[in-house]
Amino acid sequence: MVQQESGTAAGEGPRIRMATPDDAEALLAIYAPYVRDTAVTFEWDVPTVEEFRQRIAHTLERYPYLVAESADGRALGYAYAGPLKERKAYDWACELSIYVARDAHGRGVGGALYAMLERLLAAMGATYMESSQAQSYALRSLRGPAYA
């Protein structure tokens, strides 16, 4: 797995790093409102911290799972890739998910996560990336027609 980090000097945006299962509680705090208040996750119940920890660990076995942090280390958002479909022909196609804390919307967190995830997946040989989440689609559209 490729390890990448970006800086947090003033004006540079969030620090992006690879997640670990120990991030589960902080990332679940970002995810839970999406489960409770929207339909984008397709989940009925908020997972437990242990379930979320296992999801992170499972994803990291093959794909990048990124965390965006503020200068003081607070999680602002996260993004990860997963298999688009389970069939072998889809090995180089990925589904992307990006979640940003509500108080961090509009601050470039999603864009920073998307850009880093895109670079990591390209380095891994991914040739197709897809997300069905409306906000993720809007974010990709901002990057130009090749991403929408």
Question: Where on the chain are the PLM-derived regions?
Answer:
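Short acidic N-proximal helix/loop "leader" segments that mark the beginning
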Residues: M1-A10
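A short beta-loop-alpha structural element at the N-terminal edge
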Residues: R15-A29
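Helix-loop element at the rim of GNAT/NAT acetyltransferase active sites that forms part
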Residues: A29-V46, T59
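Acetyl-CoA-dependent GNAT
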Residues: W44-D103, Y114-M116, L120, M124
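Conserved beta-strand-loop-alpha-helix junction that forms the acyl-donor binding cleft
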Residues: H105, S131-R140
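Conserved G/P- and acidic residue-centered "switch" motifs that form tight phosphate/ATP-binding loops
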Residues: G108-G110
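Conserved GNAT acetyl-CoA-binding A-motif
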Residues: L121-A134
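Conserved acetyl-CoA-binding loop of GNAT-fold acetyltransferases
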Residues: G144-A148
